[in-house]
Amino acid sequence: MADIKEAAPEMVSAFFGFDKAVFDKNTGTLDLATRELIAVGVAVTTQCPYCIEDHAKRAVKAGATKAAVAEAVMVAAALRAGGGVTHGWKAMKSIADGE
């Protein structure tokens, strides 16, 4: 991260400012644990190992249970699998149209 910060300090600063605002426990409609659970699900979908570990720990620290983290993971997995199925439907449609 130091290399990125050195090469683009303003952008890195803006990114961390944005991240801090999103995960500020004193702002927003969603409580912090819910925001962290959403982050876990997104991290699983984007397959970011650092983000998965960081947000899972932060979710528990914010009050989420291990069961809630597991559920967020499974929701993300279902949506990711659903994307594969819908792409499969497109494949089937593309060959059906040519019949």
Locations of regions flagged by a protein language model:
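C-terminal structural segments of small proteins and small subunits
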Residues: A70-S94
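Alpha-helix N-cap/helix-initiation sites
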Residues: D31-L32, P49, K66
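Iron-sulfur (Fe-S) cluster-binding segments and ferredoxin-like electron-carrier domains
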Residues: V12-A14, E53-A68, M92-I95
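Acidic, glycine/proline-rich low-complexity segments that act as flexible tails and inter-domain linkers
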Residues: M1-E36, H87-E99
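Polybasic, low-complexity binding patches
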Residues: K66-V73, E99
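Amphipathic alpha-helical segments within well-ordered protein domains
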Residues: F23, A39, A56-V60
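Alpha-helical scaffold segments that form or flank carboxylate-/histidine-based iron centers
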Residues: A33-A43, A70-A78
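Short, thiol/selenol-centered motifs that function as redox-active sites or metal-ligating centers
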Residues: I38, V42-D54
